[in-house]
Regions:
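Boundary/linker segments flanking structured domains
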Residues: 1-55, 60-163
Length: 163
């Protein structure tokens, strides 16, 4: 496989490492057995045989993941997954970002990372409705997924590359 390199290595606008938690149940999340204070990202994941797959990727900015998962749209998503895949024990993995440059975590940065995660991890069974068919940003972005990354690609990049 051919290797590609950043055209402007020192000009990556958004460089983030996301530490993904081990899978946790909804019950563990709602019983506050999971530290979710720093999590900005989450994924609904299911185990198929020996492999985990991500079926939904989302973000939170002004609320906790547990609060988000009590909202009506997420209750509908859980019901849809339980209906489509009744034998799967759905779990969550929470993502804590570490932005590798000076600056605040902003809504725009979180939105850009979420969009690229969704777009780059799409497959036929994903239940995300937006950000699956296209992604655009005026930023060059590098995401390194770390920790429990079985359902994810280790690196996702967006920008001008050369070979």
């Amino acid at each position: 496989m051919k290797k590609y390199y950043w055209a402007h290595e020192n000009e990556i606008d958004l460089d983030v490492t996301i530490e993904w938690s081990k899978p946790v149940s909804y019950q563990e999340l709602f019983d506050e057995k999971v530290d979710e204070e720093e999590a900005f990202f989450y994924s609904i994941i299911g185990r198929f045989g020996k492999h985990w797959k991500s079926f939904y990727i989302g973000k939170v900015y002004d609320q906790y993941v547990s609060t988000r998962h009590e909202n009506p749209d997420h209750l509908i998503r859980r019901e849809l997954l339980n209906t489509e895949y009744p034998k799967i024990d759905w779990q969550l993995t929470l993502g804590i970002p570490k932005f590798n440059e000076v600056g605040r975590i902003t809504r725009n940065r979180v939105n850009a990372v979420e969009g690229l995660l969704i777009y780059s991890h799409w497959h036929d069974e994903v239940i995300n409705k937006s950000k699956v068919n296209s992604f655009h940003s005026n930023l060059s972005i590098r995401i390194r997924n770390h920790g429990f990354i079985e359902p994810f690609k280790e690196y996702v990049v967006y920008g001008v590359m050369t070979s």
